[in-house]
């Protein structure tokens, strides 16, 4: 490495340390290791170790760790701090790598889809008398007007999807890419969805991958989970899924809140996320059958107390349940 290159590396490191100090406060320096107070557990001693050479961090008290220092900036820094850190090469390279590994496949086209002809938006002011039935159903699930407007919920009084609430999804271009239907009468088939690929990001335009993302089973769970929640629609998330690609590309922190009876699926997702060093938290859903049964306030409280997962504590937890 030439003198010029070494000088640039030192300058880059100095800029990073200066930014970290602005976000975290004072520090001790031990070679390439910098010790700060941990903003996660707020321990009074400087136990958060940050290694700029390895682009890694770990708190020796609460076990918070990761292989992307930008996580710290994203969670505790300002908008300007985030922008400045992203100007450093590491974050750019991560995004390029993710684009290459998880980017769109050639000739990949999403099947065209549109809402049913009989669809009526429940967000309208003047509604027909038939709207009383889907509105009563939504009310029974504690879903009010704000949710109806936000999720653009409607219904079909007749036709193929007659007697069903309709919740549409939009892709990143604002086009409909899926919709979920749920019967509000006594139809034996509760859900009847279009026969198109579920490899989508439900309501992509409303998801901020730079913030915590909640993964739930169904769309009614997502409504209760609030902002930045994505339903998996009963599908299994894989390394080739569009949603997974965006999570890796943006190094998005994940909060898992799947149904309690989906233990195998939850464990599979946890293993997958930990394999890619995704910051993962587990939300306790029991004794409820799903998030959709909770009040929004209940879910938020549970999210606050979610279990942070690392390879170590996840393995110990699994062994203890054997």
Language-model-detected regions and their locations in the chain:
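Terminal peptide-recognition signature
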Residues: 38, 59, 138, 167, ...
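Phosphate-handling DNA/RNA-contact segment within nucleic-acid enzymes
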Residues: 16, 157-252, 268
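Short, surface-exposed amphipathic charged segments that create phosphate/polyanion-binding patches used
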Residues: 165, 245-251, 290-304
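Short, aromatic/basic amphipathic alpha-helical patches
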Residues: 244, 265-277
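Short Cys/His-rich metal-coordination motifs, predominantly Zn2+-binding knuckles/fingers
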Residues: 41-44, 62
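Short Cys/His-based metal-binding microdomains
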Residues: 48-83
């Amino acid at each position: 490495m030439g003198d010029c290159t070494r000088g640039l590396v030192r300058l880059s490191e100095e800029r990073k340390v200066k930014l970290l100090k602005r976000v975290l406060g004072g520090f001790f320096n031990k070679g390439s290791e910098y010790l700060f107070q941990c903003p996660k557990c707020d321990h009074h001693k400087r136990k958060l170790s940050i290694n700029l050479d390895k682009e890694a961090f770990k708190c020796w008290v609460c076990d918070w760790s990761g292989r992307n220092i930008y996580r710290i900036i994203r969670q505790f820094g300002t908008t300007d701090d985030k922008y400045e850190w992203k100007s450093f090469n590491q974050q750019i390279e991560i995004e390029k790598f993710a684009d290459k590994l998880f980017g769109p496949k050639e000739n990949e086209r999403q099947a065209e889809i549109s809402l049913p002809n009989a669809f009526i938006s429940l967000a309208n002011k003047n509604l027909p008398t038939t709207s009383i039935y889907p509105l009563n159903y939504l009310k029974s699930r504690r879903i009010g007007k704000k949710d109806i407007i936000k999720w653009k919920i409607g219904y079909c009084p007749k036709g193929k999807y007659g007697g069903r609430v309709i919740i549409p999804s939009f892709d990143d271009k604002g086009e409909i890419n899926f919709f979920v239907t749920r019967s509000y009468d006594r139809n034996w088939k509760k859900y009847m969805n279009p026969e198109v690929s579920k490899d989508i990001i439900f309501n992509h335009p409303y998801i901020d991958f730079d913030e915590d993302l909640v993964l739930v089973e169904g769309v009614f769970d997502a409504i209760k989970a609030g902002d930045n929640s994505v339903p998996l629609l009963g599908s299994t998330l894989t390394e080739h899924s569009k949603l997974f690609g965006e999570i890796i590309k943006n190094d998005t922190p994940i909060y898992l809140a799947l149904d309690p009876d989906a233990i195998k699926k939850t464990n599979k997702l946890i293993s997958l996320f930990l394999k890619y060093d995704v910051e993962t938290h587990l939300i306790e859903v029991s004794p409820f059958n799903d998030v959709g049964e909770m009040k929004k306030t209940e879910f938020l409280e549970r999210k606050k107390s979610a279990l942070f997962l690392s390879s170590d504590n996840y393995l110990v937890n699994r062994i203890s349940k054997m």
